[in-house]
Amino acid sequence: MRYIMQHISKLPHYYSVVPKEIINFATFLNQNRKNMKAFVFPGQGAQFVGMGKDLYENSALAKELFEKANDILGYRITDIMFEGTDEDLRQTKVTQPAVFLHSVISALCMGDDFRPEMTAGHSLGEFSALVAAGALSFEDGLKLVYARAMAMQKACEAQPSTMAAIIA
């Protein structure tokens, strides 16, 4: 923990807890909970054909954000997300923006009555968490995710690789 705290970028707001005992940590969480909501966002691998289509068809806000994303990306990612092939959706350069968009737009469409007090994300999901928390704009988050996806796509094309997951 000391190493992490010394080497992370200094953000304007962050909080960490190092419990002396697990029971103390559980007590802390129980005493400070007060109906708090937390959103946890997935990383790459959570994609599926049809993701976000219901939101697009039933929410004016979602439709506006998806169309804004199409403009920012310079192509209609919604066509791939809603009706594309699984193979097209699995390309890193498509997958990462698609998962980000589905996660963020789902969270933003929940309305002000259901805003989280805490957000977290796994890998790619960290960007979704930052946008859902209001620390990063939708537009900037999408641009960062797309740049990341393109860099990772290029690296994968230069050096073919795979990812393995261990489920215990």
Features from the language model and the residues they span:
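N-terminal amphipathic/hydrophobic targeting modules at extreme N-termini
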Residues: 1-8, 12, 20, 26
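Residues that mark the start of a beta-strand
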Residues: 36-37, 162
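Gly/Ala-rich beta-loop-alpha elbow adjacent to hydrolase catalytic centers
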Residues: 103, 121, 125, 137
